[in-house]
Amino acid sequence: MLGLRFSVRSLLAILVVWLGIILLASPAQAAGDPYVSQYLRVTEPVAIDLDGNQTRLFAPDDFVVGKRLFENNCKNCHLGGTTLPNPSVSLSLAALQGAVPQRDNINNLVDYLRQPMTYDGTEENYVCRQVPGSWLPQKQVEKLAAFILRAAQKAPGWGTSDF
């Protein structure tokens, strides 16, 4: 009986130590995501242009969520910010700024994601899939847009063939 009690106490002690390590050693998500902290240079909230006149602060965790959404839904066609189906139109900042309307702010990029249009804005783009609100709520699609814009601003090689 003494051996069994010692085993249970030992297991409980190990469990408590393990949980303590997990809880105390788990920093904010962004600090745990080297891409967000190192390449996007996000370690504290960052102002991203909403519509040309206003900005909104996005927290490091927002960029982690945006990155995850990009990886799960966009990366197959937009690896490293390129556009594999149409290599001449990437997700580089210059390309986003050159689109009609410009896609270099949250609102316009979200509008594009909701209803993709060709680069010149004249007709629907059927190559890029729509992101309806029933699939991705507004806050989530804004985090995705913030990730794309921050990557276009800061990530080395984003939107080029040099990634």
Residue ranges and their predicted role:
Residues 70-81, 144:
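The canonical Cys-X-X-Cys-His
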Residues 1-8:
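N-terminal secretory signal peptides that target proteins for export/translocation
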Residues 102-114, 138-149:
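An amphipathic alpha-helix signature
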Residues 24-30:
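Sec/Tat signal peptide C-region and signal peptidase I cleavage site
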